[in-house]
Swiss-Prot record:
The keyword Cell cycle applies. This is Phospho-N-acetylmuramoyl-pentapeptide-transferase. It comes from Psychrobacter sp. (strain PRwf-1). Keywords: Cell cycle, Cell division, Cell inner membrane, Cell membrane, Cell shape, Cell wall biogenesis/degradation, Magnesium, Membrane, Metal-binding, Peptidoglycan synthesis, Transferase, Transmembrane, Transmembrane helix. GO terms for cellular component: plasma membrane. It catalyses: UDP-N-acetyl-alpha-D-muramoyl-L-alanyl-gamma-D-glutamyl-meso-2,6-diaminopimeloyl-D-alanyl-D-alanine + di-trans,octa-cis-undecaprenyl phosphate = di-trans,octa-cis-undecaprenyl diphospho-N-acetyl-alpha-D-muramoyl-L-alanyl-D-glutamyl-meso-2,6-diaminopimeloyl-D-alanyl-D-alanine + UMP. It is a multi-pass membrane protein.
Length: 373
């Protein structure tokens, strides 16, 4: 909205307004807008969630120290998503289909998370939405992304560009790819996209178990993916760094900026001791958006490196459940991984800050793959 206002109308009367067409400037403006939106509306959102008694249901089989969190409002992810949506609509070029795909992903996965949170609150049951229904709708969202992105890729006039938008890029090697485009009807790409998005969504959700633990790594990874989207959306940088040039990705940078500002604004209230939790409505949507951006930029492997904390949390649950079913023994004292360290005697703040340090180091490592080709 504001992008169109400044670039297409006001610039006719005052030429400096045309600077808003710069992705770099709009990225900065988006961070500022989303950060201010989250911080300003945070107290009102928390007060409303308290008034309607949207309190967190704490599992009785988790760490005993978490029982003190009973009564803390949840579903704060609504604030994050609203901030992302508002700032994106303000500063992104809304003619770009990638922007709208990300907004639809945010709505679908956010709606599933909202339903899950609401059922937990209504029935005072931390299990929430029935797994079958939950994964059906998450699958719908992931398949929508895969199908939409493949359709856009298939409409490119240059077959080489279609392949660049579909094949899996292998970091560190300039010409190594996995030819997902080899399967007919985009099946390879769509199936792979399905697993990336659903895996990312659930991994972030599993990480969201301590005050501030998930949101700052989400910000770090969004920043890393923002660099990839900026580079791949600029033909000069893409050619120099040997990454696929995908023009649509320049506007994806704006969505990454919205996630950064909104996440930092939410952390203001989610830092220990948390005044509000994001809930599944935030975690599922943010994870799905990160996965979608990774697919859009063709940086799924770099994303797995940058989001290594999320991967470790998800794997810890898989290993714990698998080991218990097969051997009747636990691998960890408690899963997900952050609870294991709590059981070892680490304080919550120690776990969170140390995991943050690991997260930022992994993002730096992932960004290094840009140059090491």
């Amino acid at each position: 909205m504001l992008y169109w206002l400044f670039d297409s109308w006001l610039s006719q009367f005052y030429s400096p307004f045309s600077a808003v067409s710069s992705v770099t400037l709009r990225t900065l403006l988006t961070v500022i807008t989303s950060l201010a939106f989250s911080i300003i509306l945070g107290p009102r959102t928390i007060a409303y969630l308290r008034s309607v008694k949207y309190d967190q249901a704490v599992r009785d089989d988790g760490p005993k120290t978490h029982l003190a969190k009973t009564g803390t409002p949840t579903m704060g992810g609504v604030l994050i998503l609203t901030s992302i949506g508002f700032s994106t609509l303000c500063w992104a070029n809304l003619a770009n289909p990638y922007v709208w795909i990300l907004m639809v992903v945010m709505v679908i996965f956010g709606a599933v998370g909202w339903a899950d949170d609401w059922l937990k609150i209504k029935y005072k049951n931390p299990k929430g939405l029935i797994a079958r229904k939950k994964y059906f709708w998450l699958s719908v969202g992931a398949l929508f992304v895969g199908s939409s992105l493949y359709y856009i890729a298939s409409q490119q006039p240059d077959p080489a560009q279609t392949k660049a938008m579909v094949d899996l890029l292998i970091p560190l090697f300039k010409n190594w790819i996995v030819p997902l485009s080899a399967l007919p009807l985009g099946l390879g790409f769509i199936i792979f996209t399905y697993f990336v998005i659903n895996g990312s969504s659930n991994a972030v959700n599993l990480t969201d178990g301590l005050d501030g633990l998930a949101i700052l790594p989400v910000v770090f990874v969004a920043a890393g993916l923002g660099v990839f989207s900026y580079v791949s959306g600029d033909v000069r940088f893409a050619d120099y760094l040997h990454v696929p040039y995908i023009a649509y990705n320049s506007e994806v940078t704006i969505v990454c900026a919205a996630m950064i500002g909104s996440g930092l604004g939410f952390l203001w209230y989610n830092a220990h001791p948390a005044q509000v939790f994001m809930g599944d409505v935030g975690a599922l949507a943010l994870g799905a958006m990160l996965g979608t951006i990774a697919v859009m930029t063709r940086q799924e492997i770099a994303f797995a490196i940058m989001g290594g904390l999320f991967v470790a949390e998800a794997l810890s649950v898989i290993l714990q459940v698998g080991s218990f079913k097969l051997r009747k023994k636990r691998v960890l004292l408690m899963a997900p991984l952050h609870h294991h360290f709590e059981e070892l005697g680490w304080k919550e703040t120690q776990v969170v800050v140390r995991f943050w340090i690991i997260a930022i180091l992994l993002v730096v490592l992932g960004l290094m793959t840009l140059k090491l080709r």
